[in-house]
């Protein structure tokens, strides 16, 4: 679920960036999403959105699904025993790892999505 996603992000990025820094970044990080991602980090969010979309197609509710996971040496590890829980956790873990690797450009935070996300 979204609260766990916050924790997974903090696990993967070793506390180097607050999860809120990703909440309104580029065209896809945060609610909704459209257009062309502005950079690598925004592409991570687009892929995460698409992963959640696939979870919904499989009958899951990704924003509400509570799953089991642990943080081992800054690596989120999923540990659920059901299809939906594992799928959603994998979406979140992959996104968090992607966030940790991607450069953060503060100029892409809180952008004007109406003009930049066509």
UniProtKB/Swiss-Prot annotation:
Keyword Plastid: no
Cofactor: Ca(2+)
Leader peptide range in chain numbering: none
Known tissue expression: Expressed by the venom gland.
GO biological process, one term: arachidonate secretion
Organism: Pseudechis australis (Mulga snake)
Binding of Ca(2+), residues: 28, 30, 32, 49
Cofactor note: Binds 1 Ca(2+) ion.
SUPFAM superfamilies reported in the protein's UniProt record: Phospholipase A2, PLA2
Protein name in the entry: Basic phospholipase A2 PA-9C
């Amino acid at each position: 679920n979204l609260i766990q996603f916050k924790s997974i992000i903090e696990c993967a990025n070793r506390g180097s960036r607050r999860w809120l820094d990703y909440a309104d970044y580029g065209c896809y990080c945060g609610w909704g999403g459209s257009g062309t991602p502005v950079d690598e980090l925004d592409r991570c969010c687009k892929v995460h959105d698409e992963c959640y979309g696939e979870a919904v197609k499989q009958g899951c509710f990704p924003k509400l699904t509570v799953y089991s996971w642990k943080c081992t040496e800054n690596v989120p590890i999923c540990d659920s025993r059901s299809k939906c829980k594992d799928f959603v956790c994998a979406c979140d873990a992959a996104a968090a790892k992607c966030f940790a690797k991607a450069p953060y450009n503060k100029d892409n935070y809180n952008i004007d999505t109406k003009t930049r996300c066509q």
